[in-house]
Amino acid sequence: MSRLARFFFAPSVLLLLAPAAGALQVGAVVPDFGMPTLEGRPFSLAQAEKTHAAVVILFISTICPYSNYYNDLIRDLSAEFAKKRVVFVGVNSGTHETAEEARVHAREHGHAFDIIKDPESRIAGLLDAGRTPEAFLLDGSGTLRYHGRIASKLSSPDLRTAIEALLEGRPIRPAETKAFGCAIPRR
């Protein structure tokens, strides 16, 4: 490799490996956002935080096989933890899926939680979400406590473990895992 190629290659690799400048880190307060749900109800993150012990923001998709693999687990987790004042909100980003497709998909899979259609991927940009499925767990004060995958092949219940630790006042370990799945389209 020539000296010139090495000069440009090494910094490029470091940039790819470094966290994005705007990426929220675990421990940061997530800025408030509000948008209507698929059912037309207003959703406000700040309001959800005030009335719940925790908020789970899930980036989900109707067409991503990775996201669809976890539909039953997502449904079960949201129902189980609703009893413990944990609210789930789904975010369907991009224009490749319509609000009606997302609404039908939610009904078919028993997703009883609110889902926001975010065609311009503003929420994904705010949280620096890159994949479906991808989870963000916030405590009641809006602080990011866990970010990453829902589970690893259903055998490593990362999100469940994080929610349980948060509710019990224990440290969340790991507080960050690598989300895998389909890329969230950005404009």
Predicted ranges, named:
Residues 21-47:
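N-terminal "domain-start" segment that seeds a small globular fold
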